[in-house]
Regions:
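Hydrophobic alpha-helical membrane segments
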Residues: 77-95
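Membrane-water interface at the C-terminal end of transmembrane alpha helices
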Residues: 115-128
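Non-cytosolic membrane-interface motifs at loop->transmembrane helix junctions
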Residues: 32-34, 100-112
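Core segments of alpha-helical transmembrane spans in multipass integral membrane proteins
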Residues: 31-66
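Juxtamembrane helix-break-helix junctions at the cytosolic face
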Residues: 62-77
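Membrane-helix interface motif
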Residues: 21-31, 84
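N-terminal signal-anchor transmembrane alpha helix
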Residues: 1-23
């Protein structure tokens, strides 16, 4: 179960990273609902650039996760705790520095994904 869950995380992270890199607006408006069209051209371009840079960070992490699954399976628990903490803590930062949007973006479920991943982490260390 843990192994297949790890593959789901890799797929999700690859998809998310590529969306931020290659989507015209980096997913900022089309997915997250940030009203780029109401911002100046320069401000919107800066936000899109930040999303693309974040996408490359996610892509690097995804490549490491893939390497762990393929070559270093004994590190899957470490991978799970890193992904869990990243999602949970990003959700915490979102409470402290929240986005002002009409609707919650899909990333709002990030803490839930983090908690599920944390549960799978505990399963993974119990199995070892």
């Amino acid at each position: 179960f843990v192994y297949y869950f790890a593959w789901l995380l890799v797929g999700f992270n690859f998809f998310r990273s590529l969306e931020h890199i290659f989507n015209e607006d980096g997913g900022a408006e089309s997915i997250a609902g940030i009203p780029l069209s109401t911002y100046s051209t320069e401000a919107a371009a800066n936000i899109v650039a930040i999303f693309a840079q974040w996408g490359f960070s996610q892509l690097v992490l995804s490549c490491f996760l893939l390497l762990i699954i393929i070559k270093m399976r004994e590190l899957i628990p470490l991978m799970l705790i890193i992904v869990a903490l990243e999602n949970i803590l990003r959700g915490g930062v979102g409470l402290y520095k929240s986005l002002i949007l009409e609707d919650a973006p899909p990333g709002a479920v990030s803490p839930i994904l983090g908690l599920v991943t944390l549960a799978v982490f505990f399963i993974s260390i119990k199995d070892n």
